[in-house]
Amino acid sequence: MKRVYLDNGSTSFPKAPGVSDAVKNFMDNVGTNVNRGGYEEAYAAEDIIIETREKLCKLFHFDKLRNVIFTPSITYSLNYIIKGYLRPGDHVLVSSMEHNAMMRPLQQVKQLGVEFDRIPCTRDGELMVDKIEEMIRPNTKAIMMLHASNVCGTVMPLQEVGDICHKHNLKFIVDAAQTAGSFPINIEQMHIDVLAFTGHKSLLGPQGIGGFLVSDEVAHEMIPLVTGGTGSVSDSEFQPEFMPDKFESGTQNIPGIYGLRAALCYLEETGIENIHAHEMELCKAFIEKID
């Protein structure tokens, strides 16, 4: 019997061609750390990490290579952003469709004095964009929202919300867990200040690798939640302030980054627009068949 996998909202399967080979190649033939040694294999692994950052910049139309931060998952990314950027007295707006990766950290910082309000949605799950401006307060710092819901499939109008953020000088923080790799996302055009992603869903990479792309202004204000060894300025006991070291302490998931790079190569070759069109065709066919 042929297996039909329908759980891609949780994690993609199968992964992109070449992903498992890339992970295995690192584990079997490379196996080094980065920024900790001055020999050929370590430099080669560092080159792969840099190339992966470059591919993420290209995919999301972002021009700050050093501001691409790797984390273990998008949940970690959102925790870093929410707990590192928001301060007591700040107010943020979120949609009423948010995942717990957003809401649980927000509920934690609420206990410390951060406030948030939920932008309502219609009964069909569409964001009520016309309500946003009347909800903005003098202390509103950002609008934070997912791009798409893995519960009902709602896709948020990022361009419209980004335009409102730009108009009111608010930061725009986007959870792209469900859409990075299957929807075109343009950070510059959409006025996105922070884009959080995971590697194992529509990016078609392995589990255990995620990250975020962050503007200089937000990165400067953020406090690193995890500090430690970075392989840089090791004679100092204080965390580096330069990027990406400010937010990348400890050993990276280098096998995961190797796998993610392979997935990004596949996405480049196939084209995000082609992938998106194919997914929309599949969605239409599914709806027609069950109607």
Q: Which residue stretches match the model-derived regions?
A:
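Pyridoxal 5′-phosphate
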Residues: 1-291
